[in-house]
């Protein structure tokens, strides 16, 4: 079993380590693979096949997004590390698997090398056959299409010949950079019960955000009568989403989560017949489907949901993973790539309200309210507060440091050096933080581009670049 939940994080709350219970470990090792991945998920309408035979998921790995730079400098949004041991796309793939949807296509294009590698290593073995899989579809050029994908709709249109391989009845379209837990079975059942052509997931309990996936006007029967995206209307506040239509019935404006269930026939008709020039699902296909008279419904979701589309959102999502996002749910485990890493080692570390990933080496340090990723090394007398340490790809030994020091004049080991202090910062992979370094945003800068010095500032958060070297005694 190559896909596993073996890389469970270690979570600390007020010095008391919360571990997976022994029965949970027993379950992880002994749980029958067929029970886990091929449950009997017949829906309320008995004419439909189980979801693992009737629904295919299409997951977008994420395009170029300047709001997440520099985290997307060398990786796509879906490949960004989250909560110490995982990648963002793992949350969406896990939702599919836990819901019994085991035909999963991941469309990738922008900076896709690390994402393609992660998906192929993490999920290549769970299928037990050609009809249960996570298949990566990388952007391609052909004699007919010599350009790259021009948008979400264009990507699906050009890959329809792949998606049509199996006789599924619905496609579940998912962004790969959202953090949430959802039972897609309920969504599919709602879609089928209402006999909708398209069902859009709406968010009923989120605070005001600048929603990139748009707003939908929903009537009393949950029918979507209008769909607008950012730029076509002003941001609607939570308090003013209800309105009265011209016929006297009430409607409300609901933010879209960018999650769609689309019937197979409707998908083909829209992309190949009605809207053959359209490139984007949210701004063109959904409004076009409403104009064509298709039945578009809303399915409301009131759980935790975060669109990780900015540095601030990424920071919030990690902090939320400490407080309330449950990784220890036996019914809805979070899967990722299995790794052969040892348990984290701690000498006299003081750790509170934090998550520590696998294989960390923590000396006499203090960690408060932080996420510490895999293979992180933190030296003596270091204080880390309200920060995200992404981790490292390798362990670097003293002899490696001495050798590299002679070759490249790099004398700082990967990790965080003695007596350094890090507060409200993001330290990307393989960064070298010297001794007595202060990463505290001393001047309270909101936005700053200092890549030559190895860091940038976004929304008041300092981001240390991947592979950056911060010299001893630096104050940022």
From Swiss-Prot:
InterPro entries listed in its UniProt record: ADP-Glc_PPase, ADP_Glu_pyroP_CS, NTP_transferase_dom, Nucleotide-diphossugar_trans, Trimer_LpxA-like_sf
Primary localisation category: plastid
UniProt-listed CDD domains: ADP_Glucose_PP, LbH_G1P_AT_C
Keywords: ATP-binding, Chloroplast, Nucleotide-binding, Plastid, Transit peptide
Residue span of the annotated presequence: 1-55
Record's subunit section: Heterotetramer.
PANTHER family cross-referenced by the UniProt entry: GLUCOSE-1-PHOSPHATE ADENYLYLTRANSFERASE-RELATED, INACTIVE GLUCOSE-1-PHOSPHATE ADENYLYLTRANSFERASE SMALL SUBUNIT 2, CHLOROPLASTIC
Entry protein name: Inactive glucose-1-phosphate adenylyltransferase small subunit 2, chloroplastic
Annotated organism of origin: Arabidopsis thaliana
